[in-house]
Amino acid sequence: MDQYNHSSLAEFVFLGFASVGYVRGWLFVLLLLAYLFTICGNMLIFSVIRLDAALHTPMYHFVSVLSFLELWYTATTIPKMLSNILSEKKTISFAGCLLQTYFFHSLGASECYLLTAMAYDRYLAICRPLHYPIIMTTTLCAKMAAACWTCGFLCPISEVILASQLPFCAYNEIQHIFCDFPPLLSLACKDTSANILVDFAINAFIILITFFFIMISYARIIGAVLKIKTASGRKKAFSTCASHLAVVLIFFGSIIFMYVRLKKSYSLTLDRTLAIVYSVLTPMVNPIIYSLRNKEIIKAIKRTIFQKGDKASLAHL
């Protein structure tokens, strides 16, 4: 049998959690709690924004789309990670690995585009307030959100196709906590310089270009805010952007170090740490950032809860 035929390599083995030892149970509980908090928090924000008419604005429309995206983003990796922590056989099929990698990168790219759209929305609201209602219509918001999803799901296709055609040897142990391009390419039996170059070009285009546009938007926002004469006006303008900027810095800060690099070898510890940040930590803190720092969402949550409570009370009368 040809040792370079990937059909002979039916599955991969994850070694990311192989050395957790006696802390396995605690790690499982912590990761499970983080996942449940992420699901519940993002579901709450998505539902409240959709149900409360006061939040039917472009800014909150994008926040709800981001919360919905985070639900699927975490679902591509964390359930399998939880299974691998408890299971003695930490495996995934060849096709399953490619699918996980594709959806993880598709949703990640979609988030990059969506965060850019949100920055543009804030730029229009603060720098061009008179034109904002005319430009940022409901139709445009829907089209921008759809474009973010579409472009995101198109971006990794070429990377996945190239990875699927690589020959893999008998060594099938992935030194990571989930399937991803860098650890997958390190297992190939041939030179992967072309793959690394393609990955770098696509990642650099998506990550650096979107991050650049976000920073340009915020540079103009800061310039406009500093021209506001009243302190209360400046504070209100900055508060509308603080949550989004915090999410941008956490998310982009980790993925830039992870994916915008031209090398095959990498630090396993650093990559696993960064993977935890952008696959677990960022989706988990999004609900905290957008709810605890946002009075409108807190008020909407209270209105939703009290309205349901009042309806339940009336139903029992």
Swiss-Prot record:
Gene that this sequence comes from: OR6N2
Keyword Mitochondrion among UniProt keywords: no
Molecular-function GO term, any one: olfactory receptor activity
Gene Ontology annotations of biological process type: detection of chemical stimulus involved in sensory perception of smell
Annotated S-S bridges: 97-189
Family from the record: Belongs to the G-protein coupled receptor 1 family.
Protein name: Olfactory receptor 6N2
Membrane-protein topology: Multi-pass membrane protein
Superkingdom: Eukaryota
Glycosylation, residue list: 5
InterPro entries reported in the protein's UniProt record: GPCR_Rhodpsn, GPCR_Rhodpsn_7TM, Olfact_rcpt, Olfactory_GPCR1
Gene3D superfamilies: Rhodopsin 7-helix transmembrane proteins (1.20.1070.10)
PANTHER family per the UniProt record, alphabetical: G-PROTEIN COUPLED RECEPTOR (PTHR24242), OLFACTORY RECEPTOR (PTHR24242:SF227)
Job description of the protein: Odorant receptor.
Keywords: Cell membrane, Disulfide bond, G-protein coupled receptor, Glycoprotein, Membrane, Olfaction, Receptor, Sensory transduction, Transducer, Transmembrane, Transmembrane helix
Pfam families in the cross-refs: 7tm_4
